[in-house]
């Protein structure tokens, strides 16, 4: 036990973290969020340590794994990340907490072991949704991820799109977006995802990525990848510092993909983009919305993506927002099980990772029972969205502005009545009262119930 224990500490300390900010003299001084980089050959880990005013901290690894830290643990994490020798770290603990040397050394070694397992085992930035150690128990003062809908313009016209804005919706200037990125960094937001609309239609996207990278933020792109068919453009995004990309592929059947996109020829351009990013250093995943239009092609689509070499595939149900409220092709939660069983089997056989995004009512579909992880609504908690005009939304499909990032205080946005209502699960269905898994389930997506009422879905069988 002690030998393995020592190996855990040693493996951590022999792969030093490179600080991307100037070294801080003390634990208390410096910025609210600190960014560290650890490189081991071609592998790279990006660690963010976010410190709260009360001394508590949050350790975020590759924007996917999260560990909430009490003040003592936050201090020990800082010691490790700063590259402090174990002997000096133990002395610092003794001086700070007035504890015996034996206790300080044991506590530090124990924490270092847990720390090492988290940082060594964290999946690179594939899971774009938060995977909290204690699901939904943490109450941060700002989200860990912010989606930036930098434009609502798009070169597709998806019939099921959750976008509820006009395509000519006002847009911030490049300089204004720079200011937003700086403000988010000061708030302690380490993960930025550029989305839309279609974010690649903004010519300043590489500049925005470069600015976020200079701050220390991890950056991702949600895209239809049509512009990524240009390899020179892909290289420009990579050189700017882009970390990961998620590409929408609705079907392996070109006619069905193009029908859902309402854009003839979109499939060929998207797949060309997929092939380009797979040849780049980017972390790559795809996402597919399961509808009655394409559900019969999902098994073949999964095989197609595996043959392309896509390492991670995401699936989600219809989002009941924007055109999704009226498209009439959504599946009931109770219909998801058979197709997700197939997806789990196929991705497992091909060595891929499967990500399921949609928060569901666990009494209708329980993702934990299907080895898909805890999925609950994280709106106004772990993730939020800023629209192209600066309005802040609970999430990118919940079109009820909480304020504007340029004109309203963050405190008023974070503590808006709707923000609190969503975080504290204050509007759950009556049947959820007393449920033992309500903390994880959260009653499912708050937009789905309204969508069911408007769509008046009937329980149709899933086509296999």
Predicted regions and their residues:
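Radical SAM enzyme [4Fe-4S]-AdoMet core and its adjacent flexible, acidic
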Residues: 238-240, 248-250, 255-393, 397, ...
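Flexible mid-to-C-terminal extensions adjoining Fe-S/redox cofactors in radical SAM and related proteins
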Residues: 41, 392, 397-464
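Short, charged low-complexity linear segments at domain edges
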Residues: 123-143, 359-366, 401-427
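Acidic, low-complexity/disordered tracts enriched in E/D and polar residues
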Residues: 1-78
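A broadly conserved sequence feature marking short terminus-proximal activation segments
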Residues: 105-129, 348, 386-414
């Amino acid at each position: 036990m002690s030998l393995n224990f020592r190996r855990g500490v040693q493996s951590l300390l022999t792969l030093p973290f490179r600080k991307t900010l100037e070294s801080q003299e003390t634990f208390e001084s410096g910025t609210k969020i600190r960014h560290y980089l650890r490189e081991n050959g071609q592998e790279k880990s990006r660690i963010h340590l976010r410190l709260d005013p009360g001394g508590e901290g949050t350790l975020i690894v590759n924007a996917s794994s999260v560990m909430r830290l009490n003040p003592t643990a936050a201090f020990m994490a800082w010691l490790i990340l700063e590259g402090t020798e174990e002997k000096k770290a133990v002395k610092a603990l003794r001086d700070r907490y007035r504890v015996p040397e034996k206790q300080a050394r044991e506590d530090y070694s124990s924490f270092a072991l847990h720390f090492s397992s988290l940082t060594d085992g964290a999946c690179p930035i594939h899971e774009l949704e938060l995977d909290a150690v204690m699901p939904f128990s943490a109450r941060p003062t700002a989200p860990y991820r912010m989606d930036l809908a930098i434009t609502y313009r798009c070169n597709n016209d998806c019939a099921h799109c959750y976008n509820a804005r006009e395509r000519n919706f006002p847009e911030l200037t490049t300089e204004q977006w720079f200011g937003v990125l700086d403000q988010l960094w000061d708030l302690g937001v380490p993960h930025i995802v550029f989305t839309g609309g279609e974010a690649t239609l903004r010519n300043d996207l590489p500049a925005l990525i470069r600015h976020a990278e200079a701050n220390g933020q991890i950056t991702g792109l949600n895209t239809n990848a049509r512009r990524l068919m240009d390899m020179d453009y892909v290289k420009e995004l990579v050189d700017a510092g882009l970390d990961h990309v998620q590409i929408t592929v609705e079907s392996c059947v070109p006619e069905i993909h193009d029908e859902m996109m309402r854009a003839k020829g979109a499939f060929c351009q998207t797949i060309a983009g997929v092939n380009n990013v797979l040849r780049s250093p980017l972390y790559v995943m795809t996402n597919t919305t399961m509808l009655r239009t394409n559900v019969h092609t999902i098994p073949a689509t999964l095989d197609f993506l595996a043959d392309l070499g896509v390492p991670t595939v995401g699936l989600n149900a219809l989002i009941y927002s924007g055109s999704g409220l009226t498209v009439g092709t959504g599946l009931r939660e109770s219909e998801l099980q058979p197709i997700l069983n197939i997806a789990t089997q196929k991705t497992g056989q091909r060595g891929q990772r499967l990500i399921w995004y949609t928060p569901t009512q666990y009494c209708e579909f329980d993702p934990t029972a299907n080895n898909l992880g805890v999925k609950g609504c994280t709106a106004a908690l772990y993730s939020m969205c800023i629209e192209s005009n600066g309005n802040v939304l609970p999430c990118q499909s919940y079109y009820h502005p909480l304020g504007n990032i340029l004109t309203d205080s963050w405190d008023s946005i974070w503590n808006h009545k709707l923000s609190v209502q969503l975080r504290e699960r204050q509007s759950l269905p009556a049947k959820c009262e007393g449920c033992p898994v309500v903390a994880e389930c959260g009653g499912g997506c708050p937009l789905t119930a309204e969508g069911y009422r408007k769509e008046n879905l009937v329980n149709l069988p899933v086509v296999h």
